[in-house]
Amino acid sequence: MATLLPPPSKKQKRLAQEPKDLDLIPEDLPNVLVRFQASDTGENTGGSVRVPGAATEKQLEMLLNQLQETNDDPTPYTFSVIKGEGDEQTLIDITDNIWASILKPGHKSTEDQLTIVYTPRAVFKVKNITRSTAAIPGHGSTILTTQFAPHTSSRMVSGSGDFTARIWDCDTQTPMHTLKGHSNWVLCVAWSPDGKMIATGSMDNTICIWDAVKGTQIGKPLKGHTKWITGMSWEPLHKVKEGHVPRLASSSKDGTVRIWDIGAGTYLRTMAGHRSAVTCVKWGGIGFLYSASHDKTVKVWDPESGRLQHNLTAHGHWVNHIALSTDYALRTGGFDHDTTRKDFKASDTELRTKALEKFNKLANTSGRISERMVTASDDFTMFLWEPEKSTKPLCRMTGHQKAVNHVTFSPDGRYLASASFDNSIKLWDGRDGKFVTTFRGHVASVYQCAWSSDCRLMVSCSKDTTLKVWDVRTKKLLSDLPGHADEVFAVDWSVDGNKVASGGKDKMIRLWSH
Amino acid sequence: MPQNEYIEAHIKKHGRRLDHDERKRKREAREGHRISKDAQNLTGFRAKMFAKKRYAEKVAMKKKIREHEQSKVNGTPKEHNPEDGDALPTYLLDRQQPNSAKALSSSIKQKRLEKADKFSVPLPKVRGISEEEMFKVLKSGKRRNKSWKRMITKHTFVGEGFTRRPVKLERIIRPSALRQKKANVTHPELGVTVHLPILGVKKNPQSPMYTQLGVLTRGTIIEVNVSELGLVTAGGKVVWGKYAQITNEPDRDGCVNAVLLV
């Protein structure tokens, strides 16, 4: 016998009786006065314009392109409206049209003048990845970390528990070089932003520098740390002095951060201020070095003098990871999605100026160069900071139910994603730390996530052996990528967006493509 | 070559000689003397073999002593040894890992890789159970002269939402006192035992009819709900049903013990 549904309750009946809101735009909607303002420089474009109250995002985009006289080569934009004054200023995104996003919820009325802030979207589009193009064996043990080269998607480096790192040719899907030299697990790898060198940090307390093209070791292993290396970060390319090689910062379990001179093979500075293991180090683009530690603090250093600038204490437990809003610019240096072609040639100086240009563009928010930092912690929360401005956090981001392991800013700094051991990924607004959405789908701890360079997609890797691709716009799961036979520890998206590489406990490097 | 284990058989039959333990003790006490004598007197290949063996023993001993000393000095857990265990990324290094589910899932995968015989079960053969033992005849009718009703004397699993049929039509009764909902399931490789809900009876080796009736006897394959173990498939979905074989006679023990088939 088929089960009969119980009759609707009184409440359900009452709700069914009530008049429903229809998403109809009223016909007598007047025009509204709007003014366009660039999000990076804060300058106004054109004067005040009267637009229909029901103008859609597309229409605004056309109008703006007309105002800027870029009609023949239109740029896509996202729009948001400024609400409030002074310190209480917030941005409200226009998702569909002005009526539905601004007027109907009552953020603004038709009488007000709307200041519409526009942000250009990436003009290129990364295709969704849907399949595994290759599973490459080679490593003799668990793969702990992977990273794509900043200048091309055909090179990738992976570090493994078999004491080696390997450089892979992702076009032919074959190994290129095996970097042998460590006597213990290779825990972290970092490709220098000029694309010429690779640093590998190991459990044997040393760092090795390798030539990324030839696969040979440069100099001797860098010795100095007394415990294993937990993280490394290269000096941003635009900060490197003319004729110098970029320096390297490393953090270690022994509680110190060291800055290394690659040419001399010695350390220049030792920053010992943390009282416990340092978990992550990031070399910022405005002249700060950030380090997070198990002693619950985040410290901001001056890399030139090695002096402590700020001590940020807000977390209640270990700080696991740091992400900077400018990470993408710092990692890719002078390269971008367009220069990843094979025939691209540029001198060091060109790369440097380009890197500075790119950094300034990304760090520019309403006419000011600023770098935001987000820290993830074992106390289940994240904090958003602007260390240049204040030692107080901008925002505390709560919501996760277990330790947050990994945070990443989207390449344009607009969003940030946090991967947690509570099986979920949460998406936050990168500008003010507001909660946007939760991506659920993984059935075990999420270890890491990586953004595509057009900021539309995000891929996450998990203990449940899968990778999942999430669409940021629709806030939905786009594709589920099973294939690994065991936990996936590392994932990275190439700069031009063509490939994703992942590695984990099943000792296979997997490449994914659209 | 000995054709049989006649020495063991003899010992079993007659026992050891009365001074066996004392002789053994004495021989062990003089072991050092024998080794010393060998070390001094052996020549040629035998000396080589002897030296090699002795060297290996000494190395092992020294290693062990050092390990003990270190464990006494700092009292901290062992450092991550590169040779044993799996490598971990930096973000998992200092964390206590709840290991069970992980070990489970990887051991299952290992098994699959080895392509072990799919159809072999821990208990390949069971004692046959006759119909007389399984069923008790119930008399019915006004004069108690009808005997078409049967009652099962063994434990059974009755699915959720089962309703008994009208008395007139119910030929086989599954007593509610003998119904089981949960089983103590042991994971053979981990040696952990968990109390898991039974999902269904997949195969009773005695007869297909017993499978249908859900009779739980030794050797029966049941499906259990393993969702709380947190196993994951290759596709990243949570595994929740897995097969297990009953290892005891539930009607003797009053509980169901089973071993997970991996």
UniProtKB/Swiss-Prot annotation, chain B:
It comes from the Eukaryota. This is Ribosome biogenesis protein NSA2. Belongs to the eukaryotic ribosomal protein eS8 family. Ribosome biogenesis protein NSA2 subfamily. A motif (Nuclear localization signal 2) lies at residues 51-58. Keywords: Nucleus, Ribonucleoprotein, Ribosome biogenesis, rRNA processing. Involved in the biogenesis of the 60S ribosomal subunit. May play a part in the quality control of pre-60S particles. Residues 1-39, 61-86 are annotated as: Disordered. InterPro entries: NSA2_fam (IPR039411), Ribosomal_Se8/biogenesis_NSA2 (IPR022309).
